[in-house]
Design a protein with these regions (language model features):
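Catalytic donor nucleotide-activated moiety binding site of glycosyltransferases and closely related
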Residues: 57-90, 367-410
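Leloir-type glycosyltransferase catalytic cores
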Residues: 1-36, 132-192, 265-335, 454-531
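A short, well-structured beta->alpha microelement
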Residues: 21-28, 51, 66-67, 77-96, ...
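Short loop/turn segments at strand-loop or loop-helix junctions that form parts
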Residues: 38-41, 65-67, 126-127, 255-256, ...
């Protein structure tokens, strides 16, 4: 049982989060707020309601049908045709109660409690858990608070008892995701092996997401539904983007998150985190993105920054990077008294390199530029794992790399390497952000998403949009908490980043397509041998 020390504050929290009741249902879609919201228990209740209402109230009423189906629809169609007002079926209660002057309902209807959370006056028709005819506002509020306090809440990820505030926070995040997903009608460019996760990330309870192969079909589906198309940027053509612009169909870009999975995407490991961006995409500095907007405008609260700091500490302590917890192989010894710089290679035709590299795409050239800036340093070169696996472009012959670097490091996990170096030189690699988490110096030769906020040495062209100076915890809050979405690999539910990080740290983030990994490794070795 939850002890409610301040019901008023809790009501305000619920009202702000707009959770409780069937909040995942479609919004009421009212042109103006309803003067009175009426909730009959059964169809045959309607005549009794009408007897208690003035003609003006009937004309301004919003009727909520007690059940779905053809017969109720016909009854309410005739009702509003004769009396005025409007009716809705299964709707989000918060959207129906917005601005309403009163609610008329039975005492066992949870809408009574929701109305009181929202501060809406209520008329009770019959006694029940949430009120009795004649109850005043204070009595109704006590009943609503009692109902909240008598409920036991459980964390869906751990099964342990949870506080009501933690439950509200989780439901509020789910609501935010669902509302964002309502405008997505179709998806295109989604690889077959990640489609199950894409369905979960973009789930809409009222409309199944159509994932289609042909861009023209995706645009047709979206136009008919009045929605947008979710795309994977590297798997769609410029023609789709131009056609969508001409047809005024919004494109929503979906890309891997920054703490992604245990295993490589090129190894067909489905993502446990993605970003869903309506403005652009984080790796393209030529245009605004949702991440840029978040970092430039968010008022970071002390509570959010404390959460960000704790998340960063957990990630660093557990040795987690984009593709999971680091390997147990220890890094090689470094030279005593000499500055140690890590240069991570990238996939040379990766979209982040093409968009944010400022024309530089060569891993060998990146190494040379790092050496020019660090003539006395010990430099370690880390080939990109997708390239080393033989799946992607960007291989540097070891002899060429050793003509510039002091060592090529492949075995240890990235987190372990970052723990032992002094600085990192990157083009646009996520490794630069992971280095910032660990307090390392970062030099950006391109313009990654974390450049331009006052935390890196920036050699690339930084957009004026990034003039704000951020602390590390503010950057982490935007990049890891506010921008991405996460799926719990155990339950399949949307989760906070802390849950996924814990699964990775405890080795419970298993790949559902583990059977295909050996095949992909064999394919990668074959492709590497043929190059």
């Amino acid at each position: 049982m939850n002890r409610l020390d301040d019901p008023t504050a809790l009501f305000a929290l619920l009202c702000e989060a707009r959770v409780g009741g069937r909040f995942w249902a479609d919004p009421a879609g009212l042109a103006r707020p309803a003067a009175i919201v009426v909730r009959p228990r059964r169809i045959d209740d309607i005549s009794g309601h009408l007897d208690c209402m003035e003609p003006a109230e009937r004309r301004a009423a919003l009727w909520i049908a007690p059940s779905a189906g053809r017969q109720p629809a016909q009854v309410f169609d005739r009702l509003v045709a004769a009396e005025g007002g409007a009716w809705r079926g299964d709707v989000d209660p918060w959207s129906a109660l917005d601005g309403a002057e009163s609610l008329v309902a039975h005492g066992d209807d949870e809408w009574v409690a929701l109305a009181r959370f929202a501060g809406t006056p209520v008329q009770i028709l019959s006694p029940g858990r949430f009120g009795t005819p004649g109850d005043d506002i204070a009595e109704l509020d006590q009943q609503a608070a009692r109902a909240l306090g008598e409920t036991t809440y459980r964390d869906p990820f751990s099964g342990e008892e949870a506080s009501i505030t933690a439950t509200i926070d989780l439901l509020a995040e789910w609501r935010r995701i669902l509302e964002a997903n309502r405008s997505i009608a179709a998806a295109c460019g989604m690889a077959w092996w990640k489609r199950a996760e894409i369905h979960r990330f973009l789930w809409n309870p009222q409309r199944s997401l159509r994932i289609v192969a042909r861009p023209s079909r995706a645009l047709t589906v979206a136009r008919r539904a009045g929605g947008g198309v979710a795309i994977w940027p590297s798997r769609v053509s410029p023609m789709l983007i131009e056609t969508a612009r001409r047809q005024d169909v919004p494109l929503i870009r979906v890309e891997d998150g920054f703490v992604r999975s245990v295993g490589l995407g090129s190894g067909l490991v489905p993502p446990s985190s993605v970003v869903v961006d309506r403005l652009g995409i984080h790796f393209d500095p030529s245009a605004p993105s949702d991440l840029e907007h978040i970092l430039a405008t968010t008022e970071f609260t002390p509570r959010l920054l404390a959460r960000s700091s704790a998340l960063r500490a957990t990630i660093v302590a557990a040795g987690i990077s984009k593709y999971g917890a680091g390997a147990t192989v220890a890094p090689p010894p470094r030279q005593d008294g000499r500055r140690l710089v890590l240069v991570p290679g990238q996939v040379e035709d990766d979209m982040s390199v093409l968009a944010g590299g400022g024309g530089l795409t060569s891993n060998l050239e990146l190494l040379r530029r790092a050496r020019a800036l660090e003539p006395d340093a010990e430099i370690w070169f880390r080939p990109h794992p997708d390239v080393d696996a033989g799946h992607r472009k960007g291989a540097v012959i070891d002899g060429d790399a050793m003509g510039v670097a002091n060592r090529i490091v492949r075995g240890p996990g990235m987190a372990a390497l970052l723990d032992c170096v002094d600085a990192v030189h990157v083009l646009t690699s996520l490794t630069g952000f992971e280095a910032l988490l660990r307090g390392r110096e970062v030099t950006c030769h391109g313009t990654p998403f974390y450049a331009g906020w006052g935390l890196t040495r920036d050699l690339g062209v930084v957009p004026d949009r990034r003039g704000r100076r951020l602390t590390l915890d503010e950057l982490v809050a935007g990049v890891l908490i506010l921008y991405p979405r996460y799926l719990d690999p155990v339950t399949g539910l949307p989760c906070p980043p802390e849950v996924l990080v814990k699964r990775m740290a405890t080795d419970t983030a298993r790949n559902r397509l583990g059977w295909i990994a050996p095949l992909r490794r064999w394919q990668g070795r074959l492709m590497a041998a043929l190059r």
